[in-house]
């Protein structure tokens, strides 16, 4: 089975709690069991330089965010027999902390959309996209609205796991509205 595991944090690259522990271990267990499980996380500025040195550039593209398109760099690395992908945008992710910013809704709306945009660039058609917590909750929504009708994206299923119900990512609807180009 081909699984894309989407999380806002994953050990050893970036973490602030239990999600990082799960995202850093569950995909590796699935890989050891013979599944093609790949992980995607933001390329935060807080990732240690020695881990950044192991990353390889794939490409860059733009991601629709509300009324504009934002730069997205895409990197990959192997760690413990799993492939990691890193979504790069310094405006959104080169900060001193993972969360707690005024624009977290926009940052993770961008991340969710970038996950879907990156798939053809890595030539990976997952059977399942496993989303974790509010930071990736828009992936299934964006898939249904903007990608499910495109032949390359047919038949991708999604799974959503809540790790901590206390953090719900409640923000203004403005950040989830489609751009005029998407309507």
Please give the residue ranges for each predicted region.
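A conserved catalytic-core segment of Leloir-type glycosyltransferases
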Residues: 43-122
């Amino acid at each position: 089975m081909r699984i894309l595991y989407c999380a806002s944090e994953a050990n050893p690259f970036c973490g602030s709690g239990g999600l990082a522990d799960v995202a850093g271990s569950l995909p590796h267990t699935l890989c050891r069991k013979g599944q093609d499980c790949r992980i995607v996380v933001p390329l935060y500025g807080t990732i240690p330089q020695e881990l950044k040195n192991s990353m390889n550039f794939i490409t860059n593209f733009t991601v629709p965010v509300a009324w504009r398109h934002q730069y997205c760099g895409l990197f990959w690395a192997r760690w413990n027999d799993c492939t990691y992908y890193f979504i790069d945008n310094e405006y959104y992710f080169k900060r001193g902390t993972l969360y707690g910013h005024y624009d977290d809704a926009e940052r993770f709306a961008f991340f969710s959309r970038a996950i879907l945009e990156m798939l053809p660039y890595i030539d990976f058609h997952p059977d399942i996209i496993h989303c974790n917590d509010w930071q990736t909750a828009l992936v299934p929504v964006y898939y249904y609205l903007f990608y499910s009708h495109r032949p390359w994206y047919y038949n991708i299923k999604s799974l959503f796991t809540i790790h901590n119900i206390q953090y719900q990512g409640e923000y203004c609807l403005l950040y989830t509205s489609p751009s005029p180009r998407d309507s």
